[in-house]
Curated annotation (Swiss-Prot):
Keywords: Host cell membrane, Host membrane, Membrane, Transmembrane, Transmembrane helix, Virion. This is Structural protein ORF5a. It comes from Porcine reproductive and respiratory syndrome virus (strain Lelystad). Interacts with proteins GP2B and GP4. The chain crosses the membrane at residues 2-22. Minor virion component that plays an essential role in virus infectivity. Belongs to the arteriviridae ORF5a protein family. Its main location: virion. The keyword Phosphoprotein does not apply. It is found in: Virion; Host cell membrane. GO terms for cellular component: host cell plasma membrane; membrane; virion component. The lineage of its organism: Viruses, Riboviria, Orthornavirae, Pisuviricota, Pisoniviricetes.
Length: 43
């Protein structure tokens, strides 16, 4: 039972880190695109 909880926590942490990384990447890409085009982008 404890091993299942540990595996679930590991996968949840991995998902959280992956989501945060993708979120940061999207923010950087939007900022770079806005700087390139010089047009305000509404999300």
């Amino acid at each position: 039972m404890f091993s299942q909880i540990g595996a679930f926590l590991d996968s949840a942490l991995l998902l959280l880190v992956a989501f945060f990384a993708v979120y940061r990447l999207v923010l950087v890409l939007c900022r770079w695109q806005r700087r390139q085009l010089d047009i305000p982008i509404h999300i």
